[in-house]
Amino acid sequence: MKLPVFALSLIAAFSCLADEPKLEPLFNGKDLAGFKTEGSTEFWRVENGVLIGENNAAKKGNYLWTEKEYGDFVIEFDVRWKGTTPRGVDTGIEMRKPNIQLQLGISGSLKVDMSGSWYTGKPLGYPEAGQAKEAKTLMKPEGEWNTFRIQAKGNTFTCWINGQKASEYTDAKFSGAAPLGLQIHPGVEMKCEYRNMRLAPL
């Protein structure tokens, strides 16, 4: 028996939904439960359901880490930021061992916006294969909310910005499970806000 085209479309749609990982809240919108920080907590606070990291030019940097470790996962969140100096905002999301970072804002070393690009540390820094060269066309202006989706699966790291694929990078070196870290870069006057943080292990 042949199925109508409409029925086949429904089956395909439900199949896609079944394959979609179930994202659960990573941040409760009330406090820093489930996270830990190195040293002082003065860099981090929660206001009106928003997780805020803030620094000034005189302060050292800081990381806010998840208490749990993650290997293969997908995470979605809304983020907006504002820098009050010419250097702008320099932050990112750390993951895996040894740490690989998804850059948010201006790279301190390159002095250009590398949002959505993968930073692997020295000697490569931002390998060309992992750069989000079209990120500026995908993102809303500074100060507005942008939705990021990050997936770490096997040796491949993928980033989507506002629903559009921005970068993909493959590197077998970053294989160990580790906490996720939100960065506040040292010596930069900046504010970065997160909301609707949801994650699913894969």
Per-segment meaning from a language model:
Residues 5-15:
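Bacterial N-terminal signal peptides
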Residues 16-202:
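Carbohydrate-interacting regions of secretory-pathway proteins
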